[in-house]
């Protein structure tokens, strides 16, 4: 549903599982947008990822600055039948949803309907009040930047027994998520620290709905998905547990080495505006390219989005910085990569786009059970995007 950063930093597999309360593609390749994969370095890199980690399968899309897109798969798409991973797979992209939610908020800023430095209270009077935080002291910018101090709502999973499988078929209203977070103690004073919390983006989803008087999923669809013709990206309907169209099965394990449990059918409402979207690696790459390329935001708002702060423990690899729903890393090959990533029951996605237009998206078909596995996926994405940028 969302992204694993802060949970992973706790250093235990149990925390990893509870953490995957948060989320961070597959590649549905439409002929007009992609070319068939050719046997080369990327295929070997993904084969090695599956062999080393024991993850069931992987789907990746790689794009270069000239607009060429190639897709690759490795491993097994259905452990029960042994079928391969479909090349046109859709997956749950989890916390990558935050990039879409942030883009809508920044479009509202451009339209003069939202002020980044106004308090949450202006738009949601009386909504954010409790031990976990006070909307009168938190700004919209701090929500986007993950510096609000609002705690996450991991308690919902803990109360269900600590297993993500236990909440896989539970429907949550957005206010259920917010209420669980506000019942916890505030982690720090707003603006004094960075810490990843899905609650920030739940509040932003509520803000979008209050300002536009429309559902946040509808605004994401109207403002981003349709204009970019992302035909394999969609916001699941209320209560919708299946993944539409071609997709691999997604898996979850209780601990390293434990059997993989099929968790493909699940209710993504635990992620909502922080992690509910379904997409393909190719569509996700197209979105990131359009975002960083200035197609979705005016220069002033894109500059705000790319103004970053240190983001310790954002991912298994150090050195990340976080902007307004978009993260930045300096890669070993000497280029700057922008992206996010996400983790949810059944899937993990990592992605990067460079300012030169090269990009890579990798989705694995199980939630990793160790920090080493997360690092392996992140390393694979970096290798692919660096090769694409040459």
Locate predicted features.
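Secretory targeting and sorting signals
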Residues: 1-35
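Catalytic loop of the DD-peptidase/beta-lactamase superfamily, centered on the K-T-G motif
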Residues: 2-6, 31-73, 212, 259-390
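Hydrophobic (often cysteine-bearing) scaffold residues that line and stabilize catalytic clefts
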Residues: 38, 42, 93, 97, ...
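Residue-level preference for non-acidic, small/hydrophobic
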Residues: 46, 60, 66-67, 98-101, ...
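Short active-site loop at a secondary-structure junction
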Residues: 53-56, 80-141, 188-197, 272
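Short, solvent-exposed loop/turn elements at domain surfaces
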Residues: 71, 80-83, 152-154, 335
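Solvent-exposed coil/turn segments that connect beta secondary-structure elements
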Residues: 77-79, 148-149
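Short, surface-exposed loop or secondary-structure junction motifs
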Residues: 131-336
């Amino acid at each position: 549903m969302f992204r694993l950063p802060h949970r992973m930093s706790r250093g235990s597999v149990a925390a990893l599982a509870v953490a995957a309360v948060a989320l961070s593609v597959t590649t549905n390749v439409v002929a007009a947008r992609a070319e068939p994969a050719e046997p080369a370095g990327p295929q070997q890199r993904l084969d090695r990822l599956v062999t080393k980690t024991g993850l069931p399968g992987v789907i990746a899309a790689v794009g270069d600055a000239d607009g060429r897109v190639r897709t690759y798969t490795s491993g097994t798409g259905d452990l029960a039948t042994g079928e391969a991973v479909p090349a046109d797979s859709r997956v749950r992209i989890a916390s990558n949803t935050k990039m879409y939610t942030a883009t809508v908020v920044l479009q509202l800023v451009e339209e003069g309907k939202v002020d980044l430095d106004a308090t949450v209270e202006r738009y949601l009077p009386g909504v954010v009040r409790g031990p976990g935080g006070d909307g009168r002291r938190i700004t919209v910018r701090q929500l986007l930047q993950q510096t609000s101090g609002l705690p996450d709502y991991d308690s919902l999973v803990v109360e269900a027994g600590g297993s993500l499988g236990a909440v896989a078929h539970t429907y949550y209203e957005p206010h259920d998520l917010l209420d669980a977070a506000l019942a916890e103690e505030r982690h720090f004073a707003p603006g004094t620290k960075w810490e990843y919390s899905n609650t920030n983006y739940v509040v932003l989803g509520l803000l979008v709905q209050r300002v536009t008087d429309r559902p946040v999923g509808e605004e994401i669809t109207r403002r981003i998905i349709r204009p970019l013709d992302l035909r394999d990206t969609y916001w699941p309907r209320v209560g919708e547990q299946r993944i539409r169209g071609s997709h691999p099965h997604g898996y979850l394990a209780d601990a390293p080495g434990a059997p993989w449990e099929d968790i493909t059918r699940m209710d993504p409402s635990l992620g909502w505006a922080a992690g509910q979207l379904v997409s393909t690696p190719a569509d996700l790459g197209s979105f990131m390219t359009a975002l960083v390329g200035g197609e979705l935001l005016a220069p002033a708002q894109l500059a705000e989005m790319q103004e970053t702060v240190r983001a310790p423990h954002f991912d298994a690899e150090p050195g990340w910085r976080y902007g307004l729903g978009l993260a930045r890393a300096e890669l070993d090959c000497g280029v700057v990569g922008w992206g996010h990533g996400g983790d949810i029951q059944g899937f993990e996605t990592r992605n990067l786009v460079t300012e030169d237009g090269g990009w890579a998206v990798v989705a694995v078909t199980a939630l990793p059970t160790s920090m080493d596995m997360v690092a392996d996926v992140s390393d694979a994405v970096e290798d692919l995007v660096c090769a694409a940028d040459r």
